[in-house]
C-alpha cells in the first residue's frame, strides 16, 4: 500500500484517485492469482489448498526478488558432492565422505581455484546470494569448510561493506544433523553465513534407517537446539 501511495503521489493523484488505483491493482492481482490457481487445477489436477499455497509462496518470493537486476546481479551456487552416507532415494552426484575423505581436500583446493576464476569473470556484476549445497557441505571437516568459506570471503570481497550490504542470502546446507558440530557452526558464523538448512526428511526413526540416513530424530532436535 505504501508503494501504491508513492506511485499515486508521483502521478499527482488525489486521495480518491489513489484509492481507486489501489483497488484496481488489487483486483488485477487477485485475478492473476485466481487464473494461476485454476491452471494448477486444470493442468496438474492439484487440490485447491496446494494450488493456493504454491501460488501464494510464488507471490511472496516475487516480492523478495523483484528488486534483483537480472542483467547486472548474479547468484553463486557452490556444490559439495560429499555426504555422511548415501540415501537410498538420492539421485544427486554424492559420495560417502568416509570412503572418499582423502579426495575432499583435493576437491576443495580445486574448487577454490574455480571460485577465484568465477569471481574474476563476474567482477563487473553484483553478487546478491551465495548458496552452498551438495551433497552435504557440512560433511567435510571444519578445517576444510573454513578453507572454502575463507576463499569465498576473499575472492568475492565479502568484507567490503558495499558487497556485504548487497548480499541478501548466504546459505550453507547442513541437511544431515549428524554432520553438524560446534566447530563447523563457529566457522560458518565467522565467515558471515546467514542461513543454514537442516533437513531431517522424516522424524520417523524406522523410516530414517530404511532410507539409509545415519541419524535419528533426536539428533535433529539436538541440532536445532
Give, region by region, the residue ranges found by the protein language model.
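Short, amphipathic alpha-helical segments
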Residues: 30, 81, 214-218
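Residues at the beta-strand->loop junction immediately N-terminal to the Walker
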Residues: 77-79, 133-134
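Conserved non-cysteine loop/helix-boundary elements of the Radical SAM core domain that shape
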Residues: 94-225
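N-terminal [4Fe-4S]-dependent radical SAM core
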Residues: 3-76
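Structural motif
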Residues: 73-75, 87, 169
